Amino acid sequence: QELDLAVIGEKEILTAAGAASTQRIRETVENEFFLEFMKRLIRNKKTVYLLGQPADAVERLYSFLQDEYEKVKIVAQYAMETCIGDLDAVVNAINMETPDVIFSVLPSPYQEHFLEDNRGKLSARVWYGLGEHYAADEKGHSPLRWMRRIIRRKKLTNRLNEYNNNEK
């Protein structure tokens, strides 16, 4: 079954698919799509549901989103390992919250199978599979965190300069 839209998150996949233009690789390596997606998600006040396995992966995702995008509206989260019974209970839990977007950190291929089996039942318009490395570069540092620190330093410097100018 084909996806409506797939955003490639690894440059190796682009290369294998023969779509490794300089622009596409830059967009992939620098997470440009994700950054823009998050800006629009927050600006349009869209809601997010977190789904994953194991529970600590869901918690890490929650912490990451709260740290990096404090204005994001997370309506609920669900760790698949807590599911007792069939997966319809998970689908119902998601649909009860009526999220606009589901961020998934389910392992592959479990994520693909879950989505294929339940795609028609989910009310969310967007399923965003983040994978394992959504928050870190190769060295384990978040490029988003680094960028945010630079922006905050610049804002702090501007405020201090403004304060000093007002004091004179």
Short names for language-model regions:
Residues 1-47:
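Electropositive, gly/pro-rich neighborhoods at or near active sites that engage anionic ligands
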Residues 12, 106-110, 133:
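Short glycine-rich anion-binding loops that position phosphate/pyrophosphate groups of nucleotides
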Residues 42-64:
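An alpha-beta-alpha
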Residues 62, 112-121:
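Short Gly/Thr/Asp-enriched flexible loops that form oxyanion-binding sites at enzyme active sites
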Residues 69-81:
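Short beta-strand elements in bilobed, periplasmic/extracellular small-molecule ligand-binding domains
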Residues 81-85, 123-156:
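Short, flexible loop segments at boundaries between secondary-structure elements
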Residues 94, 98-108, 124:
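Proline-aspartate-enriched helix->loop->beta-strand connector
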Residues 157-168:
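A charged, well-structured terminal subsegment
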